[in-house]
Amino acid sequence: GVFEPDAQTEMAMDYVARHAQEEAPFFLVLSIGTPHNPWTKDNVPAKYYEMYKDTPFPPAPNYSDEMDPYGDAWSNIEKNPEKLQEWMRIYYAMTNNLDWNVGRLRACIEENGIDEDTIFIFTSDHGEMFGAQGRMKKNSFYEESARVPFLLSWPGKVPALNLDLAMSNVDIMPTLLGLADVQVPEGVEGMDLSP
C-alpha cells in the first residue's frame, strides 16, 4: 500500500505541475494528518521506523507519571515506559516522513519555476504531550500541545525572520490576504501579521 502522506503529496505535486503555467493564481491546502496516533509501527513506512527503532528518547523534563487531575480520561498518561518509548519512535518516524514530503513539495514548486510567486506556509494544529505534565495527546494549553511551528516563506518578498510570538490559526487567512494586498473583510477573527 501507499502511505497516505506520500500519496497526498504526490497529488499536491501533480496539482502544482498542472497549474504552474496558468496565468491565474491558485491556492492549495495540503492537510497531512501525521504525526498522529495510532502509534503503531504498521502505521508508518518501515524505512522510517527503522531509523528510530533502537533510539532511546528521554522523557520530557516535566514528565510525570502522575495523571493530571484536570485532564480528560482519554488524555491520561500511559504508565508504561516501554510503550511510551515506542510511541515516540513512531512519532519521530512519522515526522521524518513529513519532512521528506514537505521537501518534495517545495522542490516541485521550485522546479516548476513558481517559488518566487508562491507563499508557502507550514504549520500544525497541535503538538503532542507524551507524558509532559502527566498527560498524553493534546487539548491543553501546555507548551508541548499549544506551541507548534509556523513557517511562512515567500522568496524575495518576505524577509527571513525567526520570531517567538503567540499567534493562532485564525491569523493565517488575514495574513495571507494582507500579503496579497487584499482587504481583510470586517468581522474576520484573527490579525494580519504580514510584515
Q: What is each of the regions a protein language model found here?
A:
Residues G1-T9, M13-V170, G178-G187:
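Active-site-proximal cap/lid insertion segments
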Residues E186-P195:
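Short, intrinsically disordered, charge-balanced linker/junction segments flanking boundaries
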